[in-house]
Design a protein with these regions (language model features):
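Conserved short S/T/G-enriched processing/targeting/catalytic segments and their helical context
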Residues: 1
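Noncatalytic scaffold domains of N-terminal-nucleophile
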Residues: 5, 9-184, 188-211
Length: 211
């Protein structure tokens, strides 16, 4: 849709990058990070954006070791200590700044994802295949369980709607305020508090200082 409204490939990439958190949550989310390579046709320049996650300021070299000094996979893979400061929102915003047409705002590009999160997407294909594999892990988190599980604890079945109203609110904050809507204010405070409550070390300052 973006190119038909006068947008560039960069606009389209940002719009597409905003959708996986809603429609492909196990692999694409605003709590992660990534890389993007952009070719600027007008100047012939190639631009690379590194928006991978960064370690919280309180991270140490020994934080993933057990009492005997050996690596502990549970700490590094399945605990809140492993939560890095997310870069996706900053990366997509920078891509929009560097390669956008100037005709479409960040809100214009995120709005379709907001609608999908609010109105729901069908549980099909990858979501239907992978939810059963993640059922026990999802059930551990009170904020995720009502989204991906039914009231009886079973996973959403093919054909059911995946509704994500809280994600819609977060995306709306980003659309309204840009990266600050995610890295500062209520969203950042709730995110940092949830990580800390689960035993992690990420703080609101870590989020605010992400670059």
């Amino acid at each position: 849709e973006s190119p038909h409204r006068g947008g560039t490939a960069g606009d389209a990439a940002v719009a597409v990058g905003s959708a996986p958190p809603v429609s492909y949550p196990r692999a694409g989310n605003i709590g992660g990070g990534g890389f993007m390579v952009i070719h600027l046709a007008k100047t012939g320049q190639n631009v690379t954006i590194d928006y991978r996650e960064t370690a919280p300021a309180a991270a140490t070299a020994a934080m993933f070791l057990d009492a005997s000094g050996e690596p502990d996979p549970k700490k590094s893979r399945d605990s809140a200590l492993s939560v890095g400061v997310p870069g996706t929102v900053a990366g997509l915003a920078l891509a929009h700044e560097k390669s956008g047409s100037g005709k479409l705002s960040l809100a214009d590009l995120i709005d379709p994802a907001i609608a999908l999160a609010r109105n729901g997407v069908d549980v099909v294909d990858d979501i239907a295949d992978t939810l059963p594999l993640a059922q026990q892990r999802i059930a551990r988190w009170h904020s995720s369980a009502p989204v991906f599980l039914n009231s009886d604890g079973s996973v959403l079945a093919p054909g059911q709607d995946l509704l994500q109203p809280d994600l819609a609110v977060t995306l709306r904050a980003i659309a309204r305020d840009g990266p600050k809507g995610f890295y500062e204010g209520p969203v950042a405070e709730k995110l940092a508090a949830a990580v800390r409550k689960a035993g992690g070390i990420m703080t609101v300052d870590d989020l605010k200082n992400y670059r």
